[in-house]
Regions:
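C-terminal catalytic histidine-bearing segment of alpha/beta-hydrolase fold enzymes
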Residues: 162-216
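Alpha/beta-hydrolase fold nucleophile elbow
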Residues: 93-103
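Gly/Ala-rich beta-loop-alpha elbow adjacent to hydrolase catalytic centers
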Residues: 102-106, 110
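Short beta-strand/loop motif that positions the catalytic acidic residue
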Residues: 149-152, 156
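Hydrolases whose catalytic domains are alpha/beta-hydrolase-1, hotdog thioesterase
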Residues: 109-113, 135
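Serine-hydrolase catalytic machinery in alpha/beta-hydrolase-like enzymes
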Residues: 1-94
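A conserved short beta-strand
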Residues: 119-132
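Conserved alpha/beta-hydrolase "nucleophile elbow" surrounding the catalytic nucleophile
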Residues: 20-22, 101-103, 153
Length: 216
């Protein structure tokens, strides 16, 4: 884990809990949060975690094994989520708004943590999340303050279209979700996405959302 905690008077009270995508490491999400805060005059506080499985020979890490089923994937995410929530149960973080943010596998992990710990997080930013197997999840009775921001590229073929549709419908049922889609973007991140996250967080006064699309 890499961390940066700003404690100066007037510092942003948000704490970002961040999870990278498959084959990457904790630096991926640090680059993302640095881009989100660039030019805002403020510095983010964050915990950026590295995946629990190292990728042999090629470097990088991931959060659950290749080819695992839905229940195993959920168990792996639950183990990470329980450990992280235990870590957050510290006076150091007591006054912080806690925001999950993850890309791909890390986006799915962020979603599972928000669902399994409904009172812990103020928001969850899900960047191109994997969503395989979540069709039976029903968030219509989701009693939580957590807001969701779901983001996909229109040309993302890494996450099947059916899984993207599942993500939109599952999150729409919570009544606390927003969705953005980026024309021509594959399984990646672009400038508009960074800008939309910035606006979702209230880091800019601009209230327009050029990438916004209906959730369902």
């Amino acid at each position: 884990m890499s961390s940066s905690i700003e404690v100066a008077p007037g510092a942003d009270d948000r704490l970002f809990v961040m999870f990278h995508g498959y084959g990457n490491d904790e630096r991926e999400m640090i680059r993302v949060i640095d881009a989100i805060y660039a030019g805002t005059g403020s510095l983010p506080s964050y915990l950026s975690l590295r995946g629990t499985y190292d990728r042999a020979f090629m470097g990088g890490a991931y959060w659950y094994p290749d080819g695992c089923g839905v229940e195993e994937r959920r168990r792996e995410c639950s183990a990470v989520g329980d450990a992280v929530v235990s870590l957050l149960d510290s006076p150091m973080y007591a006054s912080r708004r806690r925001i999950l943010i993850g890309f791909s596998q890390g986006g799915y992990l962020s979603y599972r943590m928000a669902v399994e710990h409904p009172e812990t997080f103020d928001a969850a930013i899900l960047m191109s999340p994997s969503f395989k197997g979540e069709k039976t999840t029903d968030l219509s009775a989701f009693d939580s303050p957590t807001r969701f921001l779901l983001l996909y590229g229109s040309d993302d073929r890494t996450i099947p279209a059916a899984d993207q549709d599942t993500a939109r419908h599952v999150l729409a049922a919570s009544g606390r979700a927003e969705y953005r889609e980026y024309a021509g973007m594959a399984h990646s991140i672009n400038d508009q996405e960074i800008n939309d996250i910035r606006m979702f967080l209230g880091l800019e006064n601009n209230t327009t959302h050029p990438g916004q699309a209906p959730l369902v």
